[in-house]
Curated annotation (Swiss-Prot):
It holds the Pfam family OMPdecase. GO terms for molecular function: orotidine-5'-phosphate decarboxylase activity. Pathway: Pyrimidine metabolism; UMP biosynthesis via de novo pathway; UMP from orotate: step 2/2. Keywords: Decarboxylase, Lyase, Pyrimidine biosynthesis. Belongs to the OMP decarboxylase family. Type 1 subfamily. Substrate binds at residues 10, 32, 58-67, 113, 163-173, 186-187. It comes from the Archaea. This is Orotidine 5'-phosphate decarboxylase. The keyword Lyase applies. GO terms for biological process: 'de novo' pyrimidine nucleobase biosynthetic process; 'de novo' UMP biosynthetic process.
Amino acid sequence: MDKRIIVALDVKEKKKAIDIAESLSDIVFAFKINWPLVLYSSPEVIGEISQYGKVICDFKVADIPYTNSLITERVRDLGAWGIISHSFLGEESLKSVVNAAKGMHVFSVVAMSHPGSDMINSNAMQLMKLSIECGVYGFVAPANKIDDLRMIRSATDRVIISPGIGAQGGDPYTAVLNGSDYLIVGRSVYESDKPELEVSKLQQTAERAIEDRERLKNS
């Protein structure tokens, strides 16, 4: 069974991030890093983490096309496997990310997991249509807002990665059953006394949900 867990390294200490990545390298699908880790260390941390697995840079790129291109090119050159971009800025801005990626996987945010995200989430279908036209690899959709997740899954067969598990209240089984392909989990893993065990439990839950999802689809 494919690995289904993406660990969010939402820490600011480079050594801690690298230690976590090294310990989990064999059992996760990818590592997601955000601006705090880069700003507190250096951009080169992208390449350092990528020695232990795929790195998705959650930079939620959201600027004019030229600036987006510069950000994406640098992330690609540093060795990232994927990058997350906002889609609400429109076609030209999102296309600039896709074009600059040149093989790096682009994930488009079409719905978010935090309170107050209704302005974006209510436009999820329009943002998804735009993102598909721009050629993104996959989508970011919330594990803790099942109606939004289910709606997005019903309209696409592209990859969906989902934050909102654990601290934000999302249930891993329910999220995968309703369309998530990969679960993004942070604090509940790296703050655990046994992070490897936590990832293994989440992986088993995801596998069970995938099996049930396929069974329901074929029934």
